[in-house]
């Protein structure tokens, strides 16, 4: 599986020259271990991979007993793994480092020693249980890894050429044309339904069997539920309650999370730790309400108002159709043909959130329920562009899952806040268009924002 993060690994190796370890954080099953081991095989003379979920006690004892004597530490490490390490030409991988925090703390001394490069991979690496007894090393560069994005899915499907066309047309703000748009949307629907978990994608590419794909996705969902019970530390019930309600909350027209559906009288201060846990575990994407669509969205963040999306839309589909344990092939095919009577808006909005987060955007939305009609509006997403123009850098986004829709909220937002805003977007299922200063983007162009 070709992944974009590989280029970041190459850049770290060439630019950093052993000054820092690289920590790759991501949800379980997004492909961290696979891509790091591929990198080790391709870019180093030798490597050692220590899986802290499944390693010898003798290896763990090395970190407790020999960090003061690194010559002996490395001698035993090479003996235990039967691998010869070469200074500045070998890599040591700490896989699932959250399972053994002492190894993460040791990075300070190992990097200072300078003999080898180090990559750490982990999930839940910032959760209190995994860091409370260690000093987090400053000699550590952290990057996030997400489920496969649409371009990576196209690579897996051997459809690279169409992505280049999509990029070219986005740059020129020109439509793809009927035939190529239809092909791009067909591929995008496959991506949305299968999701971006590498094993699910690989199975789909090899078999085109949705039932096998669904079995894999449900195993991942079960793994996430087990992680909540294991790592949520006193918050298990709250985190599980939120996690299980994500599909039904997104099914509603107004997708703000309603705590009253968990417990009457529930308050955000009781549950904000649970939402934080899901966001840090990268199992969910939290979208915060902003009090105004203006520059400095973090300053306008409203903690009491949020939406909670699944980090992977393929997993959301398997959660939403959970009645029969394994979703039937016929249901998947109806979903593929857009003939399943379901509120597809929740799937489309979820995958837009997923793509924006993977691009590096923090997620915000804006809503105003004023009695004045001109002030009453709901904007699905606000994103900050990297450069501030004369009109600042906030772009409002509305997401539409059907061909027939209105954009009254977006039009009101542009009228009221025109001096604050950059380009407004409608993300929809049709081809690219531009009208009255609003850019209408097909779903598959979202990752280019």
Descriptions of predicted regions:
Residues 158-348, 354, 362, 368:
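Interdomain hinge/linker elements that couple catalytic modules in large macromolecular machines
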Residues 93, 117-123, 144, 153:
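Structural recognition of the conserved hydrophobic beta-strand(s) that form the central parallel beta-sheet
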Residues 43-58:
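Conserved catalytic segments around the Walker B and adjacent sensor/switch elements
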Residues 2, 13-22, 29, 38, ...:
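A cross-kingdom feature that marks ATP-driven nucleic-acid transaction machinery
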Residues 54-88:
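Short glycine-rich substrate-engagement loop in P-loop NTPases that contacts/grips substrate
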Residues 85-102, 255:
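Conserved P-loop NTPase "ATPase switch" module shared by AAA+ and STAND
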Residues 32:
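Conserved lysine of the Walker
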Residues 109, 126-142, 154-159:
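Short regulatory helix/loop adjacent to the ATP-binding pocket of P-loop NTPases
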């Amino acid at each position: 599986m070709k992944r974009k993060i590989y280029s970041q690994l190459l850049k770290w190796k060439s630019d950093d020259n052993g000054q820092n370890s690289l920590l790759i954080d991501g949800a379980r099953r997004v492909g961290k271990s696979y891509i790091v081991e591929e990198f080790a095989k391709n870019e180093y003379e030798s490597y050692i991979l220590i899986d802290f979920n499944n390693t010898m006690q003798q290896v763990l004892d090395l970190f407790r007993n020999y960090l003061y004597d690194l010559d002996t530490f490395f001698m035993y490490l090479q003996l235990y793994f039967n691998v010869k390490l070469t200074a500045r030409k070998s890599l040591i991988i700490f896989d699932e480092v959250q399972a053994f925090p002492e190894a993460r703390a040791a990075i300070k001394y190992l990097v200072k020693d300078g003999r080898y490069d180090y990559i750490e991979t982990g999930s839940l690496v910032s959760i209190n249980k995994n860091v409370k007894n260690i000093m987090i090393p400053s000699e550590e560069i952290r990057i996030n890894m997400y489920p496969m994005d649409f371009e990576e899915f196209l690579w897996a499907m051997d459809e690279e050429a169409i992505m280049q066309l999509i990029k070219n047309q986005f740059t020129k703000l020109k439509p793809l044309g009927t035939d190529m748009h239809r092909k791009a949307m067909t591929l995008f629907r496959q991506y949305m339904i299968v999701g971006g978990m590498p094993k699910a994608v690989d199975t789909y590419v090899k078999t085109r069997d949705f039932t096998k794909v669904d079995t894999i996705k449900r195993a991942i969902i079960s793994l996430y539920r087990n992680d909540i019970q294991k790592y949520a530390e006193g918050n298990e019930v709250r985190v599980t309650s939120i996690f299980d309600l994500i599909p039904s909350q997104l099914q509603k027209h107004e997708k703000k999370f309603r705590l009253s559906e968990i417990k009457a009288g529930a308050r955000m201060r009781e549950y904000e730790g649970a939402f934080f846990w899901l966001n840090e575990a990268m199992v969910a994407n939290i979208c915060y309400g902003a009090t105004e669509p203006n520059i400095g969205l973090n300053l306008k963040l409203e903690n009491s108002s949020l939406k909670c999306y699944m980090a992977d839309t393929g997993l959301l589909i398997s959660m939403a159709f959970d009645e029969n344990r394994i979703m039937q092939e016929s249901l998947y095919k109806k979903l593929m043909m857009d003939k399943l009577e379901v509120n597809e808006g929740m799937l489309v909005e979820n995958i837009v959130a997923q793509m924006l987060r993977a691009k590096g955007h923090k997620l915000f939305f804006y809503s105003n329920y004023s009695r004045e009609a001109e002030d009453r509006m709901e904007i699905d997403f606000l994103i900050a562009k990297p450069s501030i123009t004369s009109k600042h850098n906030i772009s409002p986004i509305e997401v539409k899952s059907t061909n027939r829709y209105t954009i009254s909220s977006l039009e009101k937002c542009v009228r009221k806040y025109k001096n604050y805003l950059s380009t407004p977007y409608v993300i929809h299922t049709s081809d690219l268009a531009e009208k009255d200063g609003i850019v209408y983007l097909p779903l598959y162009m979202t990752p280019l924002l």
